[in-house]
UniProtKB/Swiss-Prot annotation:
This is Triosephosphate isomerase. Keywords: Cytoplasm, Gluconeogenesis, Glycolysis, Isomerase. Gene3D superfamilies: Aldolase class I. It catalyses: D-glyceraldehyde 3-phosphate = dihydroxyacetone phosphate. Its EC number is 5.3.1.1. InterPro entries: Aldolase_TIM, TIM_sf, TrioseP_Isoase_bac/euk, Triosephosphate_isomerase, Triosephosphate_isomerase_AS. It is found in: Cytoplasm.
Length: 255
């Protein structure tokens, strides 16, 4: 059975005490709910190794929120793919709107990161999505095409095999206002159809997560959509209880 992919993006949050209590709770209550899900946790870089130790005997994978395009050298403050792989990272988030806007990351930079992650046999979680203004001007599909095209051009039709795409409409991130699940379903179908125009990979092998103001009260309607294959969760992943509630709902749907 195909698994549901749930990624926790902690962003710039967490501390040693929080991490300890978070995993203490998960270890007590989560064991029977992880089988039907692939759960990934992406903490701040400084806590990657601590989280790695906590998940060593759990069915949870380690993710990174970012990676540099350089492997080594005089690049103060950066983290290379070799370092991430060395400590056990399996998934790397790239293209998040906060990186695009706050750190001025272009489609070209994101495509380079994508290539580096694939070359290192890790799995990229590629974020795409439109702003509220772009949505109002009916530019959602055009924006997503642009965000995918450079990767497709540089890496060819095999680029989208064994990856995760995360559709995160920027107007829904951290606002408390989630997108309509049926609208998200249509966008996911569009993304899959667009990829399949250029690639012969199996449709069922295209994994697309949704991200944007997800919580345990609204998640069921998203999980029920056939082309929503996972979730990229921000604020709701900081509470072990809330995060586990979401995992439980996904587990029950896929049981």
């Amino acid at each position: 059975m195909k698994k549901f992919f749930i990624t926790a993006n902690w962003k710039l949050n967490g501390n040693i005490k929080m991490i300890s209590s978070f995993f203490k709770y998960l270890k007590l209550y989560s064991s029977s709910y992880l089988e039907k899900n692939t759960v990934i946790i992406a903490p701040p870089t400084i806590y990657l190794e601590r989280v790695c130790k906590n998940i060593s005997n759990m069915n949870i994978f380690l993710g990174s929120q970012n990676v540099d395009i350089n492997l080594n050298g005089a690049f103060t403050g950066e983290t290379s793919i070799l370092m991430l792989r060395d400590i056990g990272v399996k998934y790397v988030i790239i293209g998040h709107s906060e990186r695009r806007f706050l750190h001025h990351e272009t489609d070209d930079i994101i495509a380079k990161k994508f290539h580096l992650i694939k070359k290192s046999n890790l799995t990229p979680i590629l974020c795409v999505g439109e702003t509220e203004i772009e949505k109002k001007h009916n530019q959602t599909e055009q924006v997503i095409q642009r965000q995918l095209n450079l990767i497709l051009k540089n890496l060819g039709t095999s680029a989208f095999k064994n990856i995760i795409i995360a559709y995160e409409p920027i107007w829904a991130i951290g606002t408390g206002v989630s997108a309509d699940p049926e609208h998200v379903q249509l966008i996911h179908v569009f993304i899959k159809n667009y990829i399949l125009k250029y690639s012969s990979i199996n449709r069922n092998d295209i994994i697309i997560q949704y991200g944007g103001s997800i919580n345990h009260t609204n998640v069921k309607k998203f999980i029920e959509q056939p082309d929503i294959n996972g979730l990229l969760i921000g604020n709701s992943s900081l509470s072990a209880k809330e995060f586990l509630e979401i995992i439980k709902i996904a587990h029950e749907h896929y049981s």
